[in-house]
């Protein structure tokens, strides 16, 4: 049966009849944009208003005709599932109407770059109620403003993303409440999002394993980065969640070392922090790898075993209601006792050392963070500030940690990434601090050639405890892979 399109549908296919027969996946295959929009509205705590989001525009490099690599704005993606440039989105909270605006057809662009997304394609691909061309956006906004007569606001993320309605004055805009509401919504992942993070971790694990199988042949950090990238791309993950960190020797003590261009000869280990992205969702994985069939010295083995203990203990403590602050404190207590046993720290009381901040010379960052659409995903900021204020601190490090909710909830994905580092800069600076009395600098300096050790996994909080989403080999399994590759 053919029926005229309603006014609502004319945005989909203007002035025609919808007489197609299509067989598509069910809505469960689509990114759950409508569910996310409703969740964000619930966090806003209002029953009316218009959410207005601007997608990432096409932008060229400065003084160039070449475009910057496209990366969709994450808040836009969360409410749309659209990974296309130059799109817009509105969500009418009262009428529960989610509308996507796609670029109008441009013949020149289509000839050079291929056609942009059509209304029909977008409607069937995305979980939205209505799809329109961008040329209709201003008129729709004007109609909405006139209808509501400033009784309800247009919610925006930033003042730089205001809607363009020059014909209307004194538009009621709210740029304060949408961002924290969407942050609160994004913290707990739904089943679809967890599948994406799991897939990103699976590809990351393949790439980490490939590096382990070939590390004995490599002579430069560049080769590690290249092989990891190639493996991810060959499995469909063209983007990385962040710049690859492949720091060997002393470079492993630089937390975000990304030059990845130095020779491996004469060095004992490499810290490989690298995670693939899948459909805009991140993974965050770190493995510390020996440059040989075993750890090069007892110094290296001892530090690896200490970090391994820190991670295993903290992961085992994850459950609903536990705070990242308590987990980070636990990691510091283990690090302090371990460094005391190795003679790096003098034999003072563990709590005294903790409160002095001396352990942060060797473990200067947070234990973990949320993972999702960003590798350092959104969280509730007040808790982050309070946790940073309460933890071990000193004057020359600002902890990353505790970008987390007050208590972990099922559906959250967080990293557990303890590390112990021997940074020449940090150790030299520590000599000038009151905390210097807790550190045995003669012993600490013997560990400087190691650089540092970090182990990182992505952990899903569940109703019964946790699930480790990261399957990249570590520990004895990692060593066995390296040995088998050498033997073959």
From Swiss-Prot:
Listed GO biological process terms: proteolysis
EC assignment: 3.4.11.9
Annotated transmembrane regions: none
Residues given in the record as Mn(2+) 1 binding sites: 284, 417, 456
Cofactor note text: Binds 2 manganese ions per subunit.
Positions bound to Mn(2+) 2: 273, 284, 456
Cofactor(s) needed: Mn(2+)
GO molecular function, one term: manganese ion binding
SUPFAM superfamilies: Creatinase/aminopeptidase, Creatinase/prolidase N-terminal domain
Catalytic activity: Release of any N-terminal amino acid, including proline, that is linked to proline, even from a dipeptide or tripeptide
Keywords from the named record: Aminopeptidase, Hydrolase, Manganese, Metal-binding, Metalloprotease, Protease
Pfam families cross-referenced by the UniProt entry: AMP_N (PF05195), Peptidase_M24 (PF00557)
Role: Catalyzes the removal of a penultimate prolyl residue from the N-termini of peptides.
Family statement: Belongs to the peptidase M24B family.
Protein name, UniProt field: Probable Xaa-Pro aminopeptidase ATEG_00858
């Amino acid at each position: 049966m053919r029926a005229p399109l309603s006014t609502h549908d004319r945005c989909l296919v203007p002035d025609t009849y919808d007489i197609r027969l299509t067989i598509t996946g069910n809505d469960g295959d689509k990114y759950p944009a409508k569910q996310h929009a409703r969740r964000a509205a619930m966090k806003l705590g209002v029953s009316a208003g218009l959410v207005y989001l601007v997608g990432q525009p096409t932008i060229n490099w400065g003084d160039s005709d070449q475009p910057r690599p496209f990366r969709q704005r994450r808040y836009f993606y969360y409410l749309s599932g659209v990974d296309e440039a130059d799109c817009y989105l509105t969500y009418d909270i009262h009428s529960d109407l989610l509308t996507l605006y796609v670029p109008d057809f441009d013949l020149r662009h289509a000839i050079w770059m291929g056609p942009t997304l059509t209304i029909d394609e977008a409607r069937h691909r995305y979980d939205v109620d209505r799809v329109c061309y961008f040329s209709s956006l201003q008129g729709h906004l004007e109609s909405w403003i006139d209808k509501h007569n400033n009784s309800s606001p247009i919610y925006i993320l930033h003042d730089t993303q205001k809607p363009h309605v020059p014909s209307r004055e004194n538009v009621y805009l709210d740029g304060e409440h949408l961002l924290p509401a969407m942050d609160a919504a994004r913290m707990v992942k739904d089943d679809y999002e967890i599948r994406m993070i799991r897939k990103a971790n699976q590809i990351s694990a393949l790439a980490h394993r490939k590096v382990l199988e070939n590390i004995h042949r490599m002579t430069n950090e560049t080769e590690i980065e290249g092989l990891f990238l190639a493996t991810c791309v060959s499995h469909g993950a063209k983007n990385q969640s962040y710049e690859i960190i492949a720091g060997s020797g002393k470079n492993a003590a630089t937390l975000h070392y990304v030059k990845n261009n130095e020779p491996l000869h004469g060095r004992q280990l490499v810290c490989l922090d690298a995670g693939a992205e899948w459909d805009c969702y991140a993974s965050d994985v770190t493995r510390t790898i020996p440059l040989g069939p075993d750890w090069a010295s007892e110094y290296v083995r001892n530090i690896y075993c200490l970090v391994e203990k820190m991670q295993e203990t903290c992961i085992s403590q994850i459950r609903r209601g536990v705070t990242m602050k308590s987990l980070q404190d636990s990691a510091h207590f283990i690090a302090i006792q371990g460094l005391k046993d190795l003679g790096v720290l003098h034999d003072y009381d563990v709590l005294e050392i903790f409160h002095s901040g001396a352990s942060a010379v060797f473990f200067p960052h947070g234990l973990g963070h949320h993972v999702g659409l960003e590798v350092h995903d959104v969280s509730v900021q007040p808790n982050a500030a309070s946790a940073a204020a309460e933890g071990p601190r000193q004057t020359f490090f600002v902890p990353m940690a505790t970008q987390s909710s007050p208590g972990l909830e099922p559906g959250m994905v967080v990293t557990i990434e303890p590390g112990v580092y021997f940074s020449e800069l940090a150790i030299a600076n520590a000599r000038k601090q009151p905390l210097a009395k807790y550190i045995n600098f003669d012993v600490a300096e013997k560990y400087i050639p190691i650089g540092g050790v970090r182990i990182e996994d992505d952990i899903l909080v569940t109703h019964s405890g946790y699930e480790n989403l990261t399957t990249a080999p570590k520990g004895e399994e990692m060593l066995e892979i390296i040995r088998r590759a050498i033997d073959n």
